Design a protein with these regions (language model features):
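Alpha-helix N-cap/N′ positions at the starts of helices
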Residues: 6, 28-31, 43
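Short, basic-rich loop-to-helix N-cap that marks the start of a DNA-contacting helix
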Residues: 40-53
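Helix-turn-helix DNA-binding elements, focusing on the entry/boundary residues of the two helices
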Residues: 11, 22, 30, 45-48
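The DNA-recognition helices of helix-turn-helix-type DNA-binding domains
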Residues: 32, 40, 66-70
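Short, charged recognition helix plus adjacent turn
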Residues: 64-98
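Short alpha-helical DNA-recognition segment
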Residues: 16-38
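A short, Lys/Arg-rich alpha-helix, primarily the initiator
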Residues: 1-17
C-alpha cells in the first residue's frame, strides 16, 4: 500500500473514531477532505497538522498508522523501536538550541 493511501486510511479512521463528520470538521471543505480520505490529494504538512489536531489526534499518530498499515503486530512494535532510537540519534545532532 502506498503511503498516500495509508495516510488517507489513517485520517478517515481517526475522524470516524472521534465521531466527526467531514462537514463537522470545520478546517477544510468536505470535497477536499473526501479527496484526502480517498488518497486523491496529499495535504501539506501544515494542513495535515491542522486537520489531525481538529480531529483531536496527534499528527504523528496518523502518520505512524500510515506506515504501520498492513504490518504484523511485531513489525509495528519494531517500527516504534526504530523511530524512538532514530529520534534519540537525531536529537544528539540537533545543534540549534531553544
Amino acid at each position: 500500500m502506498s503511503l498516500r493511501l495509508g495516510l488517507a486510511r489513517g485520517l478517515r479512521a481517526a475522524r470516524r473514531m472521534r465521531g466527526i463528520s467531514q462537514d463537522g470538521l470545520g478546517v477544510s471543505s468536505r470535497t477536499y477532505l473526501s479527496a484526502l480520505e480517498l488518497g486523491k490529494q496529499t495535504p501539506t504538512l501544515d494542513k495535515f497538522d491542522e486537520i489531525a489536531r481538529a480531529i483531536g489526534v496527534h499528527p504523528l499518530s496518523v502518520l505512524y498508522y500510515a506506515y504501520a498499515v498492513g504490518l504484523k503486530p511485531q513489525e509495528v512494535t519494531e517500527l516504534g523501536r526504530i523511530v524512538r532510537s532514530e529520534i534519540s540519534g537525531i536529537e544528539q545532532y540537533d545543534i540549534t538550541s531553544d
